[in-house]
Amino acid sequence: MAKKSTEKTELDFENTLQQLEAIVTRLESGELPLESALEEFERGIKLAHLGQERLQQAEQRIQILLQKSDSAKLSDYQAEE
């Protein structure tokens, strides 16, 4: 269990993304045995969630900073479909 908390504090967004991209590359190669592919996939899901948490934290920090400053307004992001 200590590994999870240590992992969360050690990985910043860039490292999380880099590891996730490496996992995707290995999975897309099709050369991993099934059990290894499942383990990599599970790790990738955890990294994706961690990356989402990091992005949400950054967005919250930006919103707080902009609320403190009347000179800039934050508008909601509209994804193109």
UniProtKB/Swiss-Prot annotation:
Its main location: cytoplasm. InterPro entries: Exonuc_VII_S, Exonuc_VII_ssu_sf. PANTHER family: EXODEOXYRIBONUCLEASE 7 SMALL SUBUNIT. One of its GO terms (biological process) is DNA catabolic process. Heterooligomer composed of large and small subunits. One of its GO terms (cellular component) is exodeoxyribonuclease VII complex. Belongs to the XseB family. It is found in: Cytoplasm. It holds the Pfam family Exonuc_VII_S. Bidirectionally degrades single-stranded DNA into large acid-insoluble oligonucleotides, which are then degraded further into small acid-soluble oligonucleotides. This is Exodeoxyribonuclease 7 small subunit. GO terms for molecular function: exodeoxyribonuclease VII activity. Keywords: Cytoplasm, Exonuclease, Hydrolase, Nuclease. Its EC number is 3.1.11.6.
